Structure formats: structure tokens, C-alpha cells
């Protein structure tokens, strides 16, 4: 089972014994006349929290101070949960969704429709679509979208395994559910041409503006998008 590759963030060196200067933190951590703003351990914690998506300097500071107030056992449980998830969660060998087993629960479920595959770019999209309770088929996670500017071509995505799955006689339809950004549209059109010789290819109808993200759509919008899918 392939593991999700995540680079471990390296701690930056201490500037001095009195202060830790974190380049990515937007607020000053420099030494003041009567002492430092943060101790080095707290500064390191704030910096690491700020690496998380959508977490800015103030949010990172608030989270760090909140964690310091919690009981040791609670903080240890959080740290252990993070380590366990990092160590155990990888990719499903079939659909490339997140899984702690070689094959994920969705792919193993006996009541899922094996004849329909919904193609998404990211595991978060699987979670969003599952919350609608409308789709009963299987999924395929590409691991991104075609983006030449970022050096991401078809070879960097899980397109070859998708072609292998679609070539099976039992597959009757492939639904392309990729967020409608410029890169998403490029990926959708590319896959449409690639998959049409094998099976019926449809794309979901979006109630989203161009450039919107699938994961942020509400459940009703996603459900209607699935119902209103059209053939490419």
C-alpha cells in the first residue's frame, strides 16, 4: 500500500537563547527591552501551527495558547492521534482514497454499485459527495488536476490506474466530478476524450461559480449536481 508522502517540517535554528525568530510568522518575536514576546518553545509551536491550511498568525497564536491551557493528557491524546494518523493512513490500492487498509471501506462495500465510477481530484471531494448520500457507486481519486504551470501533467496523476479500471466490462459509466477551475476544466476535457472509447462519460452539473471548490459546496447543491449530470 502506497503511503501518502508528507514532508516532515524541519525546525529552524534558534537565533539566540532569548528569542526564536520564525520567518513564516508574520508578527514580531524579537527581543524587547523588558524581555521576549514568546519563549522559544511557544514560538516553535506557533510557527508549526501556522503551516496548516487557512491558519494565520493570530489563529496560530490562539490555538497555541489554548493548547497550553489544556490538561497534559488531552494534549498527549491529540499528539498521539496525529502520529497514529500519519503512520497508519495511506491510499487505497484501488481508488486512491485515504485508507488505513490496503482497500478502503467504500471499495470493499458489497452494496456499492460496481458499474459506476465517480472521478474526483482530491480525497476531500469524496467526503463531500458521500455526505450527500446520493451516490452509491465507487470513486477514483486523481491526486490533483492537470496544471502545466505547476509541473503537474497526466503522468503525475492516477490516470493509468483509472484507465485500467474503466477497461473492465462491468463499468457502464464514469462521472467526472472535478471542481470547475481552469485546471479542473482542462482535466475534465482531457479525461473525457481519453475515456469515451471505453464507456459512457458524464460530468456533474455545477451550481458553483467558475473557480469554486467542490468541497465547499453544500450537500443539496452537490446532490442536484449528481442528478443533473450530462454526457460529454
Curated annotation (Swiss-Prot):
Residues 115-209 form the Toprim domain. GO terms for molecular function: DNA binding; zinc ion binding. PROSITE patterns: RECR, TOPRIM. Disulfide bonds: none annotated. It comes from the Bacteria. A zinc finger (C4-type) spans 92-107. InterPro entries: DNA_Rcmb_RecR (IPR000093), Rcmb_RecR (IPR023627), Rcmb_RecR_Znf (IPR015967), TOPRIM_dom (IPR006171), TOPRIM_RecR (IPR034137). Pfam families: RecR_C (PF21175), RecR_HhH (PF21176), RecR_ZnF (PF02132), Toprim_4 (PF13662). The keyword Zinc-finger applies. Keywords: DNA damage, DNA recombination, DNA repair, Metal-binding, Zinc, Zinc-finger. SUPFAM superfamilies: Recombination protein RecR. One of its GO terms (biological process) is double-strand break repair. May play a role in DNA repair. It seems to be involved in an RecBC-independent recombinational process of DNA repair. It may act with RecF and RecO. Belongs to the RecR family. This is Recombination protein RecR.
Amino acid at each position: 500500500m502506497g503511503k501518502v508522502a508528507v514532508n516532515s517540517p524541519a525546525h529552524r535554528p534558534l537565533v539566540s537563547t532569548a528569542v526564536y525568530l520564525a520567518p513564516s510568522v508574520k508578527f514580531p518575536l524579537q527581543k524587547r527591552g523588558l524581555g521576549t514576546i514568546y519563549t522559544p518553545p511557544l514560538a516553535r509551536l506557533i510557527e508549526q501551527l501556522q503551516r496548516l491550511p487557512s491558519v494565520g498568525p493570530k489563529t496560530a497564536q490562539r490555538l497555541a495558547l489554548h493548547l497550553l491551557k489544556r490538561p497534559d493528557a488531552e494534549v498527549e491524546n491529540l499528539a498521539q492521534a496525529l502520529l497514529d494518523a500519519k503512520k497508519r493512513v495511506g491510499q487505497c490500492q484501488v481508488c486512491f482514497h485515504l485508507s488505513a487498509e490496503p482497500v478502503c471501506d467504500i471499495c470493499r462495500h458489497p452494496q456499492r454499485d460496481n458499474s459506476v465510477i465517480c472521478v474526483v481530484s482530491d480525497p476531500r471531494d469524496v467526503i463531500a459527495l458521500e455526505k450527500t448520500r446520493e451516490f452509491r457507486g465507487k470513486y477514483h481519486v486523481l491526486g490533483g488536476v492537470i496544471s502545466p504551470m505547476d509541473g503537474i501533467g497526466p503522468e503525475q496523476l492516477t490516470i493509468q490506474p483509472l484507465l485500467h479500471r474503466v477497461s473492465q466490462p462491468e463499468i457502464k459509466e464514469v462521472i467526472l466530478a472535478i471542481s470547475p477551475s481552469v485546471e479542473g476544466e482542462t482535466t475534465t476535457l482531457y479525461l473525457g476524450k481519453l475515456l469515451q472509447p471505453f464507456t459512457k462519460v458524464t460530468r456533474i452539473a455545477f451550481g458553483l461559480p467558475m473557480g469554486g471548490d467542490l468541497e465547499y459546496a453544500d450537500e443539496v447543491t452537490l446532490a442536484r449536481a449528481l442528478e443533473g449530470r450530462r454526457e460529454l
